[in-house]
């Protein structure tokens, strides 16, 4: 069964006359229902067969430029890419020495970080947890900017201990989860058998006042954090991407991202970001192309790169949107702004004359010449195709019970002139 998202190819602002068109639909995005994937399943074969079956049952013809995307969770599950808290703790002890370790700038997430924090605490004697404030890296707020203003606290200058933070702000409960993450993270550390000290700061170097051994837990700013700590005298400076880069006692692993992109599988295990995602994408593309006779692109996708306007949370908690994708998905869109053409360049035309003029303008566009900075492309921000398509896929498949971990996209690379 397939769910549809359809994007019209012709903007409403251009309908200034009556004329006929041979094609009325543009991009079509379908969420494909799939069987439950299990460890050991052939993710390439299962993905391709599921999509091919859906195409046959729904009388859909594959076309050149179609995209098959499968969520990273399915790939990792089929690989059996899991690790227990004990396995992670053993790696932490081996790489840090197991004494006092700073843990800097983690995101506030039960799914993403609670088991990682527990694992780190199991492997050391003391954790100095440095939380950024007023919010974490992806926008989960401990306190508001207004609260900082009222308390007279400068988050870029002031380093607070737990007592100072509580005196200024009291108990801080996340509006969506109802969790006081400060108390929650402290309890995780202590329940794992380690001593906990909580610090609030936005300069990562602040941790060096407590220890010279640090695990940087930020995601997208981790390289800068490690560079700053090393330059400031950090003796052992690691990131989450430096842990579980190889198997530990039979664990899963990721040589590129380590623990980045992992999330809670059960109370004792995390699922790691998948390995070999590039090879998986290439193999799915090859199988689909051979079966359909068309050039079908493929990608493995994780979190979308969008920001929630209500909660102010950037959803990208994975290190990248797409860890694997075929070569046809490399690059950025190079588009003309149809509204600009209709309202400005061809403002005196209507109907079929307008349609013809815009079509000729698009056909004359040189795909190899970037339109960045040209007025006709204003408003068509050239983001990476993998970020755009991966975000589209994440929104389509959802994160709950839709049962559509595979997404099939048609017409994404078409423009107004394509029949």
Tell me the role of every PLM-derived stretch.
Residues 2-6:
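Short terminal hydrophobic/aromatic SLiMs and anchors at protein ends
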């Amino acid at each position: 069964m397939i769910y549809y998202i359809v994007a019209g190819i012709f903007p409403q602002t251009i309908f200034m006359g009556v004329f006929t068109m041979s094609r009325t639909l543009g991009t079509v995005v379908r969420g494909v229902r799939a069987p439950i994937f299990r460890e050991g399943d052939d993710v390439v074969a299962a993905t391709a067969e599921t999509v091919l079956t859906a195409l046959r049952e729904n009388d859909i013809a594959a076309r050149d430029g179609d995209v098959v995307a499968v969520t990273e969770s399915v790939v990792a599950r089929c690989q059996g890419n899991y690790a227990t808290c004990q396995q992670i703790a053993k790696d932490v002890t081996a790489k840090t020495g197991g004494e006092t370790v700073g843990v800097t700038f983690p995101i506030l997430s039960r799914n993403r970080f609670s088991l990682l924090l527990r694992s780190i605490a199991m492997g050391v004697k003391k954790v100095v947890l440095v939380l950024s404030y007023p919010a974490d890296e992806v926008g989960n707020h401990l306190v508001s900017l207004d609260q900082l203003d009222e308390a007279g606290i400068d988050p870029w200058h002031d380093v607070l201990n737990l007592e100072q933070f509580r005196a200024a702000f009291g108990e801080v409960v996340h509006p969506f989860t109802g969790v006081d993450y400060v108390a929650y993270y402290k309890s995780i550390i202590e329940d794992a058998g380690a001593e906990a000290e909580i610090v609030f700061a936005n300069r990562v170097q602040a941790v060096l006042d407590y220890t010279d051994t640090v695990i940087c837990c930020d995601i997208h700013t981790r390289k800068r954090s490690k560079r700053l700590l090393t330059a400031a005298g950090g003796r052992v400076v690691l990131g989450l991407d430096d842990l579980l880069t190889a198997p530990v006692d039979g664990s899963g692993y990721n040589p590129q991202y380590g623990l980045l992109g992992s999330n809670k599988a059960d109370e004792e295990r995390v699922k790691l970001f998948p390995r070999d995602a590039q090879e998986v994408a290439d193999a799915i593309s090859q199988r689909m192309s051979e079966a359909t006779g068309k050039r079908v692109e493929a990608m493995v996708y994780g979190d979308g790169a969008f920001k929630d306007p209500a909660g102010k949370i950037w959803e990208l908690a994975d290190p990248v949107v797409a860890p694997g994708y075929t070569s046809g998905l490399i690059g950025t869109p190079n588009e003309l702004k149809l509204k600009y053409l209709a309202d400005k360049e061809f403002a005196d035309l209507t109907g079929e004359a307008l349609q013809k003029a815009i079509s000729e303008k698009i056909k004359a566009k040189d795909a190899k010449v970037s339109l960045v900075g040209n007025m006709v492309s204003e408003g068509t921000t050239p983001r990476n195709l993998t970020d755009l398509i991966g975000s589209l896929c994440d929104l389509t498949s959802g994160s709950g019970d839709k049962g559509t971990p595979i997404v099939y996209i048609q017409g994404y690379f078409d423009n107004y002139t394509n029949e």
